[in-house]
Structure formats: structure tokens, C-alpha cells
């Protein structure tokens, strides 16, 4: 089932728009500190860093610039195209059920920001999510990533899905000896919470919120 092409759940074969679906298994095969880096392994999708000091960037689809790529969470445009990189950094990977990607114009449904395409991140259903998930990763550059997810009941009719992502890289390196940091130093924390409320006639209402903070430093080594 896919949602992105029609704004409602339909079979992938019945969607009027070609939708590519990537599951958590894809993310596990290509481990990275955030979804932003993971998407570089998708054909036609190119995350690009635009600043060597703060490492901010955007996502190009089929060669079109980042402002023409829409990023949504559960079909909702949480951030604008210009700030999409921060939206992708702020989603704990343990909460992702799948990623749906539309390449090419999707502006008929989602407006002018989706001329290049769109990336729709579908989070897990709180009712079906595991009680606890966790992932810890480190690299030989001393990058440290902790990703946690859990669910718990809130009262009699609500279930909360909570995810926390922590990233730390404070090891300045200059491999090419140009007196400029090769990778921006970062200290990043993101929290995502999704509440699911049971309603009559098997209907469900959801409420989601996120918190993101990051400190970045780059530039001259001295």
C-alpha cells in the first residue's frame, strides 16, 4: 500500500503516480547518522551539501534543485523545501515504517514545491510498533549516533510513539592540510512524538510533534 500518489492508502499497482517504496531494511543495509545521508543510495536522488562550514544542504531529484523537492512526514509538510535538510535530520530512524519517493512533478497534489518530486516519510503505527527499539553506531572518524524508539499507553484511548536521536561528532580533522575542517563538528538532538487516539467506528486520530536542536562548527582549524 502507498499513500503519496493519491493522499490515501491504495495498492502500489493502482497508484496513478509511480511511487518508490524503501523499507527499514534498506536503511539497515546502508547505515548512516541520518536519513539525509541514507538517501544518497537511491537512484535519481542526490543529497548535496551546500556549505562546507555548517554542512547544510538540500536534496536534488532528477537534477532539479532542492527548493523543488518537497519533504513530508506522514503526508504533512512539516518543513519547507528550503529547510528540508533539518526535517530529515530530525527524524529518528527507529520510528520509520517506510519512505515513499515520487520522482518528477507531483505539484498537481502538493503544490509548486513538489515540481522536482517529493519524499514522504511514513512513521510506524503506535499500535503496531515494538515496545522498544534501539540502535547505536560509531565510525572510525569518532562519529557517535544513538537512536531509540519506544511506545506506551496514555490513558485508555491513546498510544504514544516516542523516538529520540542523538548525534555527536567533535573530532576536527584536516586530511588534506588546507587548514579547514573536512567535516563540520556537530552536536545534535532530535525528539519525535506521535500520539494515536482511538475513535468510534474504528477511526483513528493522530497528533505528532517534534523537537530539534543542533550546534554546528566548521571553518579554519585555528
Regions found by a protein language model. Name each.
Residues 2-28, 58, 66:
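N-terminal periplasmic "start-of-domain" segments of outer-membrane beta-barrel proteins
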Residues 6, 104, 122, 135-141, ...:
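Outer-membrane beta-barrel pore domains and translocons
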Residues 19, 27, 39, 99-101, ...:
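Non-catalytic regulatory/gating segments with a bias toward low-complexity or hydrophobic composition
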Residues 36-77, 97:
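Extracytoplasmic beta-strand/coil segments of soluble accessory domains associated
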Residues 53, 111, 139-142, 183-187:
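Short sequence motifs at beta-strands and strand-loop junctions characteristic
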Residues 60, 76-103:
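Short acidic/polar hinge/loop motifs at secondary-structure boundaries
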Residues 90-131:
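A beta-strand signature from Gram-negative outer-membrane beta-barrel systems
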Residues 120, 128-129, 151-222:
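Periplasmic-side early beta-strands and strand-to-turn transitions of outer-membrane beta-barrels
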Amino acid at each position: 500500500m502507498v499513500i503519496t500518489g493519491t493522499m490515501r492508502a491504495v495498492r502500489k499497482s493502482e497508484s496513478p503516480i509511480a511511487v518508490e517504496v524503501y523499507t527499514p531494511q534498506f536503511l539497515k543495509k546502508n547505515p548512516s547518522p541520518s536519513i539525509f545521508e541514507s538517501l544518497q543510495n537511491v537512484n535519481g536522488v542526490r543529497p548535496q551539501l551546500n556549505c562546507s562550514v555548517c554542512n547544510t544542504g538540500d536534496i536534488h531529484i532528477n537534477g532539479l534543485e532542492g527548493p523543488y523537492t518537497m519533504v513530508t512526514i506522514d503526508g504533512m509538510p512539516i518543513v519547507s523545501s528550503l529547510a528540508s535538510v533539518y526535517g530529515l535530520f530530525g527524524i529518528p530512524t527507529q520510528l520509520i515504517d517506510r519512505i515513499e519517493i515520487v520522482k518528477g512533478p507531483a505539484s498537481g497534489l502538493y503544490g509548486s514545491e513538489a515540481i522536482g518530486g517529493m519524499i514522504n516519510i511514513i512513521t510506524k503505527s503506535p499500535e503496531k510498533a515494538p515496545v522498544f527499539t534501539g540502535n547505536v553506531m560509531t565510525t572510525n572518524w569518532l562519529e557517535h549516533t544513538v537512536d531509540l524508539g519506544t511506545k506506551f499507553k496514555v490513558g485508555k484511548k491513546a498510544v504514544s510513539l516516542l523516538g529520540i536521536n542523538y548525534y555527536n561528532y567533535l573530532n576536527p580533522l584536516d586530511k588534506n592540510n588546507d587548514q579547514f575542517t573536512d567535516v563540520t563538528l556537530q552536536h545534535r538532538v532530535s525528539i519525535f512524538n506521535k500520539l494515536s487516539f482511538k475513535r468510534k467506528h474504528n477511526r483513528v486520530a493522530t497528533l505528532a510533534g517534534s523537537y530539534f536542536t543542533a550546534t554546528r562548527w566548521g571553518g579554519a582549524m585555528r
